[in-house]
UniProtKB/Swiss-Prot annotation:
Involved as a receptor for mab-20/sema-2a in the formation or stabilization of cell-cell contacts at several stages of epithelial morphogenesis. In early embryonic development, required for proper ventral closure of the epidermis. During male tail morphogenesis, involved in precursor cell sorting and in the formation of distinct sensory rays. Involved in axon guidance of SDQL neurons during neurogenesis. Probably in response to stimulation by mab-20, regulates fln-1-mediated remodeling of the actin cytoskeleton and thus axon guidance and/or fasciculation of DD/VD neurons. The chain crosses the membrane at residues 1140-1160. Residues 1-17 form the signal peptide. Residues 750-837, 840-924, 928-1040 form the IPT/TIG domain. GO terms for cellular component: cell leading edge; cell surface; plasma membrane; semaphorin receptor complex. Residues 1159-1197 form a coiled coil. PANTHER family: PLEXIN, PLEXIN-B. Residues 18-1139 are extracellular. SMART domains: IPT, PSI, Sema. This is Plexin-2.
Length: 1785
């Protein structure tokens, strides 16, 4: 059996085809940049020079070359609230903006190379920046999620932005907000927004808004995909992963579809939680886990072809009428309709479904750790980032296209960057890694470590390719030429590889797979020369001319490329010189192409034809040797002697001795020469003999010499030499001079010096070797004459004179060895030492069992086991190779393999001819097997304890663990052998082995198969892929910097790297001195242990004392031992440092008291100075308050009536619009119906059929029911539907009235049934109530002339009162207003100016006009337009953007008046910027202004926009531009001194406000007193206080409510609430708040505030609950509290009067309806409305058809069939998913 060392050697060399370790990695350069705030996202610029990083409140650009900041801009914090508008001007009740951090949700590079950034503030709106991060535009459109924790994904495709965002706080300023949308760039509006036929967006229903979390979006072919995780509505159900798909050009989202992705394990375990996902070419790679906190991740690979087919299967099922659409969260969950007539393929964009067929894949790889990001590297590798600062690298399995094989890991970041790898982006040969607080640039591959093409191509790194021009291993991206997949193969040596000096011959290299030179050249370099020669490439290799060499040499010839110094091949190259051969024979017999030039008598490679010798004299070596010291003639045979010139004498020369040579025909006879050599100890040697003539050497031959003295040292050896040597023995030495006395020589007696062995078994058979002198001259001299202790010994080996080996026969005693030498004369030699015959025996053996495979080391105990010459052991008749013989009583052997388990085998010891059997047999048992190892991780240094489970483990006595290179042959050992401890048959513990440094080089991570050395059991020598151990980098701990101070009762925290990758807390042994510190926590970079409370002695872990008083901290993990440094306990150091501490404390107290005194003195001076300053400011505040109070008192006493001029302005009469215009405003003011694409595509006959269908009330009721029951329909859509129905029904007003009344009755009954009776007409969130309010407004319009007159006078009075004082052009705040929210709380100079205006239409006339010096230019232009076009209706007046004002300045000429400076100048100013006023231009009383037409240029266009957010000329046709309050102000500066709720800086110079806001509340009384009469008149007219008659339709409406209240059992109070809400809230409040419905007047922010107060007062008058008013009540309610209290009883009286009035007769009602029908007949747009209504019905056709079919009465009227017929006609011209309606029988 083989010993262990041989076993390891064989395994290490087993099939050595693999010549390198399976995984190699090289340290990579890393660039890192830290951020103070959390990083949200990053992108790389298109020029690959800059990284744009969005972090908390910042946007930064980094230079990739040096990772330094180029530009940076601050994004926040900003004043924001989700309950406020984007500009912060309006908020919901009790909400105010507050400082909010900005978290970037979208970061993209636009096609214009601008940066698009969308944050979590301002409703998720976006901004654009240029490359230097200067702000370009700000949008107010909500695009991203406006919550830090909500998800948003985006992608730019075809100049469009794909956005998927999770729902956040339900703010009315964001609703409706799409979950997935396509937005146009740069406007960011949703494509086809508002189109009734569909828009490029989907909206989640309220119940599902918080269910979707979007993770990733990508494109594949012509589809867009979005990946989302969906939380089920039922908590018991698991989360699901949904893959959303729609076509790139689908602007209506008809193709919107979803499928479920599932990743399952081998045991069918579902992994529902998606951690990361990436799409790469035709694969979708995703990482899943069982939960969000699971430490294990599983990777699944989905084929994009399977994804496409799964979508197709689901769509095809729905197309065939199977299943339902299954998209309830977006309002599409109706049953699928058979549409088999529609062609469908895998790329179809016509249908979209949710589907019930999911896509399931099995897990391809499991990772211990949570994967947070994925990145694909071409089609070769996948990188997975984890939460532990690691990047796990995978490559695609060569045999299974969807299988991943891990080939390495990288650790990135440091302690400051955080540990989660959030995002990875490939950047050339690098990867940019985003971590929570850092951006890292890391190398992708480890190719630079491989130096040869073969190593590169067999490397486990799939990114490594061999770049031929540079002769380096790199990635394909770095190589200028195509990388090669085959290494060049050099076929033999270059031709020629040998050249002569002074010659030049082209040298050819035969190389296979040598690519042609593209972008480089091949070059040849000879030896160490720095220059090279260009080589010519051919299909078979290259050739290059050689240099001309002047001296012989052997060197390397290198084949290089022109851009690399790494040789492609290297060969030995020889330059020879024939002239170095001095004789003709040596010249002619040389291995080079040399010839002998006889004429020149020299050797050359180029002799002339006549000079070249054809034959040379060749002396043959001498056959018989010559004795050294003899003198004799030497005869040598030779050939070609006839070529010699016999006219000259020839001589022989040996060792500088010369003798005359006689030349015969075939021999040379040299005269006698004395052959002597001094100081030689060699028995034989060779010396050269030269044949010379005339100082030239003809040839040289070797002559053999010998020395008899050195050939034999004793007499017998000398006489036994060959007679030809003529050696003889005399004078006690062997010499050729004794040849004559050889026959008479007498040798010394034979002598035995020693023999071995000295004992043997009595059975004989022992071979004894006897050493001595003169033991005969031949074997015959001693044959049969050797006796050992009296027993014959037969010769088996004989060496003349000095050694005899013989085999002894049986014997029983001890005695010497006798040898008789000689034949004629006998001499006897006898040994002085005795040989003993002994008896061998075996007593016992251990162990007596072992594995069937053999190899058990069995130890035998007995007697005389070391005797004899040959010892062997057999077990069961098979050899048991002896490992060692420890002594004569112990020997060890390795058992052979057995034939059957459980078989007993005899153990026999053979010593020569002796056989001894052991009494106990040896038992063969089952081979051990390994089932599992735990844990399966270790580090390079090894030494970690692992537990091995298996069967029959105790069959062997020892086991050793090692790692091998490959799970399949060929493989070799890559570690040392680690010992194991066998506990029982199923369990043993092993230490993990140390990885050999020569193998690993710098391995960071690898998984290696495991093997065990367990006797001869080969089944466990390689456990294959089943059990592989992960090898991690060694854990390292940072040494202490100096002495570490520690509190004894606290835990000791140690910092390091790779601590928990392959180690648990129990693997670490931490010693403080010689006492343990027990580990409680291990993190990847931190180790926490609990040690002794008191400081141990100053020793190491072994208790060996060290210098100093502090103990040493030592950490032992596995075979690693780390000394971190000394530690000192704080309480231990206290006594020695107490005195210094007290002294320092006293010094500190003295210094502190001194400083405090100085500071106190200075603070006191500052406080006195501050007090004087505040006192002065308080006096200014008192003066301002006093001034404001006096002015307010004066206004209260003097301004309570309108001036005559104002009265004229009021008495102009109401500017009522005509009835058709009123109806158009009423129906479409909130709903744009300017165009209808569907009308052009709809056939007239279809519209006629549809209109006929509307003549059935049941059909209209069904439409309303479908809308009311659909929770996904928004309020605006309901309003649009109500307007469409009213517009269509106005063709027949009587029928319209019947429909509205019937719907109202049903609605009242339903509200009462649902216990919502008191809410009727209050919220108006139903289609019925909206239809009623529009119908009621139309009916009352012609009867409201008195009320409209009062309302118009009130409007003019409010307008005059507001314009009498300054109005802020930005905020709308006015000095004179009745709305507290819009009260101007500033002291503004109200100087009135009288100016002259020259209109551009009447240049010779001027108009006098009163304005305020503080008026902005846009306000002046409004007043000018109102004065000049006083008698022109407002809608026909020119807009203020259509003319300009020029100031006729006598000194400066004409000065153009504008609100702001040009954009270029404005951008350099500090924001906010004040709007210019007349005072700023120096305009005073009597100045002249001239109107001129506006000239539109690019600059003026930008100026006119004035950062208003307006994007078209039409939007500028308002009464005034809308200026952003964040950038502009007029009268109220945001940082002004008025005491507001804004917190001021402590170092602000104006610590106190200029005034108190409450002081200005008296202006409300002034304004109220002025307009009070008009308000009362209007309210009384609404209450019909002065009229005895009422509109018939009002009586009709009230009677209906009374009847329905009686029928449904509703109380009188609730009925009166119905009347008040229906009459006031739904009709009059709408008129008051929107005067543009009835008057041709402009829109104004300040007027809107005033009218809101009037509307609130009117509603308070009709309120039936007594309000509780106090100091904290809104001022607007307190203003008219007395009037409300007076008028509230009159509202009740109004209802009673109407109720008690005579009932409305049918004739009177019919007349009223006929009159209304005549009025509405002039209205237009019903065809357009009919077409839009048809489009809506088509979109909800399935639901409507189902409702119609469920009603028996409607089915009898065949309404479902009629609807189906209409919609089928529509399908021929416009076919999409919402139109899939079939007949419902």
């Amino acid at each position: 059996m083989l010993p262990e060392s041989v076993f390891l050697l064989l395994i290490s060399h087993f099939l050595r085809a693999v010549t390198q370790p399976p995984f190699e990695t090289e340290g990579v350069k890393q660039k890192l940049f830290h951020f103070s705030g959390h990083i949200d996202d990053f992108i790389v610029s298109r020029d690959q020079q800059t990284i744009y990083v969005a972090s908390l409140n910042r946007l930064t650009s980094l230079s990739i070359s040096n990772f330094s900041i180029q530009h940076e801009v601050s994004l926040g914090p900003v004043q924001d609230s989700p309950w406020c508008s984007a500009d912060g001007k309006s908020c919901l009740k009790d909400n105010r903006p507050f400082p909010t951090d900005v978290r970037t949700k979208i970061l993209q590079i636009l096609p214009t190379n601008q940066i698009l950034q969308c944050g979590s503030v301002k409703l998720g709106s976006c901004s654009t920046f240029n490359s230097k991060l200067s702000l370009i535009t700000e949008s107010t459109i909500a695009v991203a999620a406006n919550s830090p924790d909500a998800s948003t994904v985006s992608k730019i495709i075809d100049n469009r932005l794909i956005v998927a965002a999770s729902a956040t706080k339900e703010s009315p300023y964001r609703d409706p907000f799409p979950a997935v949308a396509i937005r146009n760039l740069p406007g960011l509006n949703v494509e086809n927004a508002g189109d009734l036929e569909g828009e490029a967006a989907v909206f989640l229903r309220a119940a599902y808004k918080n269910a979707f979390k979007f993770l990733y979006t990508f494109t594949h072919q012509h589809f867009v995909f979005v990946v989302a995780m969906v939380t089920p509505r039922e908590s018991r159900l698991p989360m699901t992963t949904r893959l959303i798909r729609f076509c790139r050009n689908d602007t209506k989202f008809e193709s919107y579809s979803e499928i479920e992705l599932q990743c399952r394990g081998e045991d069918n375990t579902n992994y529902p939680f998606l951690n990361a996902i990436i799409q790469s070419y035709d694969k979708l790679i995703a990482s899943f886990s069982t939960s969000s906190t699971s430490p294990k991740s599983s990777i699944c690979v989905f084929s994009m072809q399977k994804v496409k087919l799964t979508f197709w299967y689901n769509v095809d099922r729905c197309r065939s009428g199977t299943d339902s659409i299954r998209l309830p969260h977006i309002g599409r969950d109706t049953k699928c309709v058979n549409k088999a007539h529609i062609p469908l393929d895998e790329d179809s964009c016509e249908l979209g479904v949710g589907g019930s067929i999911e896509l399931v894949e099995m897990s391809t790889k499991d990772i211990m750790g949570k994967v947070t990001s994925l990145m694909a590297v071409d089609q070769k590798a996948i990188f997975a980032g984890t939460t532990t600062s690691q990047i796990v690298m995978f490559k695609w399995d060569e045999h299974h296209s969807n299988q991943l094989e891990e080939y390495g890991r990288k650790e990135v970041g440091d302690g400051r960057t955080g540990s989660e790898v959030s995002k990875m982006v490939k950047f050339g040969d690098f990867v940019i890694v985003q971590m929570p607080y850092g951006i890292i640039l890391e190398e992708l591959s480890t190719c630079s470590h491989h130096s040869s093409c073969t190593e590169c191509l067999v490397s486990v790194d799939p990114l490594c390719q061999w770049c031929h021009p540079t002769q380096s291993c790199t990635t394909s991206a770095r190589c200028t030429s195509p990388v090669t997949s085959q290494c060049p193969i050099v076929d033999g040596d270059p031709i020629p590889s040998i050249v002569s000096v002074n010659s030049s011959t082209p040298i050819s290299f035969n190389i296979h797979h040598l690519p042609p030179p593209v972008g480089f050249t091949y070059r040849c370099q000879f030896g160490t020369s720095t220059s090279s020669i260009k080589a010519n490439w051919t299909t078979t290799g290259v050739s290059c001319p050689s240099e001309i060499f002047t001296s012989p040499n052997t060197f390397e010839i290198l084949l290089l490329t022109s851009i690399s110094n790494n040789p492609i091949s290297r060969h030995n190259f020889t330059v020879y010189d024939c002239s170095g051969y001095g004789t003709c024979s040596s010249c002619m017999s040389s291995e080079y192409n040399c010839a002998w030039c006889s004429g020149l008598h020299k050797c050359s490679n180029s002799c002339g034809a006549l000079e070249k010798s054809k034959a040379c004299v060749k002396i043959q070596p001498m056959r018989l040797p010559i004795a050294i010291g003899s003198q004799q003639e030497i005869v040598l045979e030779a050939s070609n002697l006839d070529t010699l010139d016999r006219r000259h004498e020839h001589f022989c020369k040996v060792n500088e001795q010369v003798s005359l040579a006689k030349i015969a025909s075939d021999s040379i006879r040299c005269g006698k020469i004395q052959l002597t050599l001094s100081n030689t100890t060699s028995a034989n040697m060779v010396v050269p003999l030269s044949l010379i003539t005339r100082d030239s050497v003809i040839d040289i031959a070797n002559v053999s010499l010998y020395s008899c003295t050195n050939l034999a040292s004793d007499c017998s050896s000398c006489l036994a030499l060959s007679p030809s040597l003529s050696c003889g023995w005399c004078n006690r030495q062997c010499s050729h001079e004794c040849h004559e006395s050889k026959a008479t020589a007498v040798c010394d007696p034979p002598r035995i010096d020693k023999f071995e062995p000295t004992s043997g078994p009595i059975e004989g058979g022992t071979i004894i070797k006897i050493y001595g002198n003169d033991l005969g001259m031949s074997v015959e001299d001693v044959r049969g004459k050797i006796y050992v202790a009296g027993s014959r010994c037969n010769i088996v080996e004989y060496h003349v004179s000095n050694m005899i080996a013989c085999q002894v026969d049986k014997g029983v005693s001890s005695g010497p060895i006798r040898i008789s030498v000689g034949r004629a004369t006998v001499a006897v030699a006898e040994s002085s030492e005795l040989y003993s015959f002994v008896r061998t025996s075996i007593f016992s053996a251990y162990p007596l069992y072992g594995p069937i495979s053999g190899g058990t080391r069995i130890t035998l105990y007995g007697q005389n086991l070391s005797s004899g010459s040959q010892t062997s052991v057999t077990v069961g008749g098979m050899p048991c190779p002896i490992e060692r013989v420890n002594s004569s009583t112990v020997l060890t052997c390795l058992t052979p393999s057995g034939t059957r388990i459980g078989k007993s085998a005899r153990v026999v010891v053979h010593v020569d001819h002796s056989q001894t059997q052991l009494d106990q047999p040896f038992e063969y048992r089952s081979d051990p097997s390994i089932s599992s190892i735990f844990p399966m991780t270790s580090f390079k240094a090894g030494g970690r304890i692992v537990y091995v489970q298996g069967n029959s483990l105790n069959t062997v006595q020892t086991a050793k663990l090692f790692l091998i290179s490959s799970p399949t042959p060929p493989f070799y050992i890559i570690s040392d052998l680690a010992p194991c401890h066998i506990i029982n048959s199923t369990l043993m513990t092993c230490m993990t082995p140390k990885i050999l440094e020569t193998i690993t080089r710098r391995v960071e991570y690898t998984r290696q198969p495991v093997g065990f050395h367990m006797d001869n059991v080969t089944a466990v020598a390689n456990l294959g892929r089943r059990i592989q151990m992960g090898i991690y980098p060694n854990p390292t701990l940072s040494p202490f910097k100096g002495v570490r101070y520690h509190q004894g009762e606290q835990s000791l925290i140690l910092e390091g790297h790779n601590l928990n990758l392959a180690a648990e807390p129990n693997d670490f042994k931490i010693f403080i001195g010689n006492e343990r510190c027990y580990v409680t926590l291990v993190d990847v970079r931190q180790l926490v242990c609990s040690g002794p409370v008191r400081q141990p002695k100053a020793t190491d872990e072994r208790g060996i004392p060290i210098n100093g008083d502090n103990p040493l901290v030592t950490v032992i993990v596995g075979s690693l031992r780390m000394e971190l440094g000394l530690i000192e306990y704080s309480d231990h150091a206290l006594p020695s440092r107490l005195s210094l501490l007290i002294l320092g404390l006293l010094l500190f107290i003295v210094v502190t008291l001194t400083v405090m005194c100085l500071v106190f003195k200075r603070r006191r001076q500052e406080r006195e100075k501050e007090y004087r300053k505040i006192q002065l400011q308080m006096e200014n505040l008192e003066n301002n308050v006093r001034k404001e109070c006096k002015q307010a008192f004066a206004e209260l006493q003097t301004n309570l009536v309108l001036s005559p001029k104002s009265a004229n302005s009021v008495n102009l009469g109401p500017e009522l619009i005509n009835f058709p215009h009123f109806v158009e405003n009423l129906l479409w003011s909130d709903n744009n119906l300017t165009s209808a694409p569907s009308l052009a595509r709809t056939l007239p006959v279809t519209l006629a059929q549809f209109h006929a269908l509307l003549s059935f009330k049941g059909f209209i009721f069904t439409i309303v029911e479908a809308a009311e029951s659909d929770v996904s329909i928004s309020t605006s859509e309901k309003s649009m539907l109500a307007s469409l129905l009213i517009s269509v029904l106005l063709r027949n007003f009587s029928y319209c009235t019947e429909v509205v009344v019937d719907l109202l009755r049903a609605h009242i009954a339903r509200s009462v049934q649902n216990k919502r009776a008191e809410l009727l007409f209050r919220n108006s969130d139903s289609v019925v109530e909206k239809m009623f309010s529009k119908w009621m407004s139309i009916c009352l319009y012609s009867h409201l002339t008195p009320q409209m007159n009062s309302y118009f006078y009130l409007y003019k009075a409010l307008q005059y009162q507001t314009d009498k004082g300054p109005v802020d052009a930005v905020t709308g705040d006015a000095r004179y207003t009745i709305n507290e929210a819009k009260l101007l709380r500033e002291s503004v100079d109200t100087k009135t100016l009288k100016i002259r205006v020259i209109p551009f239409e009447k240049c010779d006339e001027s108009i006098d006009l009163e304005v305020h010096a503080c008026d902005a230019i846009c306000q002046v232009k409004q007043k000018v337009a109102s004065a000049v076009y006083r008698e022109t209706p407002y809608s026909q007046r020119p807009r203020i953007t259509q003319f300009e004002l020029k100031y006729k300045c006598p000194k400066r000429g004409d000065v153009k008046l504008t609100d702001v400076l040009p954009i270029e100048t404005l951008s350099q100013k500090k924001l906010p910027v004040k709007l210019f006023t007349l005072a700023d231009y120096g305009i005073s009383d009597g100045c002249t202004l001239e109107m001129s037409p506006a000239v539109y240029t690019a600059e003026s266009y930008r100026n006119s926009l004035a950062d208003s957010g307006q994007s078209s000329w039409s939007s500028l046709d308002r009464c005034s531009p809308i200026y952003s309050s964040s950038k502009y102000y007029h009268l109220t500066n945001p940082s002004s001194g008025t005491m507001t709720f804004k917190k001021k800086s402590s170092n602000d110079s104006n610590l106190l406000p200029k005034s108190i806001p409450e002081v200005y509340l008296t202006r409300l009384l002034t304004s109220k007193g002025t307009v009070e009469t008009y308000v009362e008149d209007f309210l009384e007219s609404v209450l019909y206080m002065h009229d005895s008659s009422y509109p018939p339709i009002l009586k009709f409406f009230f009677d209906i409510l009374d009847r329905e209240a009686s029928v449904n059992g509703v109380s009188e109070n609730i009925c009166q609430q119905w009347k008040a809400n229906g009459y006031v809230l739904r009709v009059w409040a709408n008129f008051v708040r929107n005067p543009q419905l009835v008057f041709d007047v402009p829109h104004s922010i300040s007027m809107d505030a005033n009218l809101s107060t009037v509307a609130q007062t009117m509603m308070d008058c009709f309120s039936f609950s007594e309000p509780v008013l106090g100091a904290h009540s809104p001022s607007s309610r307190l203003l008219f509290a007395k009037d409300v209290a007076r008028l509230r009883p009159l509202s009740v009286d109004l209802f009673k009067r109407v109720k008690n009035s005579p009932p409305l007769g049918m004739d009177e009602l019919r007349t009223e309806l006929v009159n209304m029908a005549n009025d509405v007949s002039t209205c237009k747009g019903s065809s357009l409305a009919l077409s839009e209504l048809l489009s809506w019905v088509r979109g909800n056709g399935i639901r409507i058809s189902q409702l119609l079919s469920s009603n028996e009465q409607f089915s009898q009227q065949r309404l479902p069939q009629k609807l189906s017929q209409v919609l089928h006609v529509c399908l021929e011209t416009d076919n999409h998913i919402y139109s899939t309606i079939s007949d419902y029988e």
